[in-house]
């Protein structure tokens, strides 16, 4: 009593847990660039370099990496249902900025989001390296990742029991674009039928159906009739001369045909999702940062962002306060 409060510094730095909490929140939640953050701190009278700020966040990353390792093992538990997506970012390599990619994998049931980065690549090795020997029930992606990933890896013995899904929203949006921009009248009917699948699943959500009940509805006569109508329309359109069709319509038809099995795999299981919106919403934060001209000065900077966003994304899925979690974490590691 009567003594000043003891300020604990993070080992190897002069930063307190509270200060690290503040700069991490500014950079990775509020999307403030290092340059603006540095300017703000110097305007307040602090003598600090941008490199020092990065080094402090790097120190915080070493502790968060241990947490992310645990979260990853939870996200990839046996028979998990996961969604994945990627987005591009700018990373400085060899004195210039290069377009690179950060990925995210989300496990809805476990409320876990893991961001990962492997030298900025968008290739199949990034995903397969991340998955390791995980025995997943299903993995959902968009069409590009399906093209790159499903071609070999998911058809191999390594992932033979994993159901690969492709997002239905992407298929529907392609037909909407073909109708609005390509002027293709039949494209509207495709989008209407695909929309009906979404409406049905939304009704199941509103009714609070169990996976077993949802499976029964997905296998109903009405659903099968809708599927037959869509397939008949697709076969009919593909049999016609495509010379005078818009490229948007050709792309939509080819997409639906190529990924038909993966798009409608959800009908065979009451637990599987219909789209990849969960992963897309989770990674949208990085898209916002990119639009704010955020860039990473190195691969290490992108890897650090992946660590912080893994924690932030997971906390958001739990509906908890990011500010409070980060602060409590850094205060309790000492």
Describe the role of every protein-language-model region.
Residues 2-334:
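Catalytic center-proximal scaffold of phosphoryl-transfer enzymes
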């Amino acid at each position: 009593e009567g003594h000043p409060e003891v300020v604990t510094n993070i080992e190897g730095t002069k930063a307190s847990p509270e200060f690290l909490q503040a700069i991490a929140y500014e950079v990775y939640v509020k999307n403030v660039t290092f340059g603006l953050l540095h300017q703000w701190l110097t305007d307040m009278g602090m003598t600090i370099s941008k490199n020092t700020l990065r080094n402090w966040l790097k120190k915080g990353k070493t502790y968060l990496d241990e947490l992310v390792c645990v979260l990853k093992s939870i996200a990839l538990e046996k028979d998990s249902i996961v969604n994945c997506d990627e987005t591009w970012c700018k990373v400085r390599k060899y004195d210039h900025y290069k377009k690179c990619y950060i990925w995210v994998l989300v496990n809805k049931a476990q409320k876990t989001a893991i961001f990962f980065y492997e030298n900025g690549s968008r290739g199949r090795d990034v995903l397969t390296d991340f998955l390791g020997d995980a025995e997943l029930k299903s993995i959902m992606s968009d069409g590009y990742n399906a093209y790159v990933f499903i071609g070999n890896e998911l058809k191999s013995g390594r992932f033979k029991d994993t159901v690969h899904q492709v997002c239905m929203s992407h298929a529907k949006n392609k037909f909407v674009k073909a109708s609005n921009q390509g002027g293709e009248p039949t494209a509207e009917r495709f989008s209407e039928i695909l929309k009906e699948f979404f409406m049905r699943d939304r009704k199941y959500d509103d009714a609070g159906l169990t996976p077993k009940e949802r499976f029964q509805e997905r296998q109903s006569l009405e659903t099968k009739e809708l599927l037959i109508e869509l397939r008949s329309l697709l076969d009919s359109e593909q049999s016609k001369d495509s010379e005078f069709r818009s490229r948007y319509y050709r792309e939509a038809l080819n997409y639906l045909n190529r990924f038909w099995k993966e798009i409608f795999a959800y009908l065979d299981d009451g637990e599987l999702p219909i789209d990849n919106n969960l992963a897309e919403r989770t990674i949208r934060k990085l898209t916002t940062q990119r639009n704010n001209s955020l860039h990473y000065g190195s691969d290490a900077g992108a890897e650090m962002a992946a660590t912080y966003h893994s924690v932030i994304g997971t906390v958001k899925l739990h509906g908890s306060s990011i500010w409070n979690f980060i602060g409590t974490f850094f205060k309790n590691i000492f």
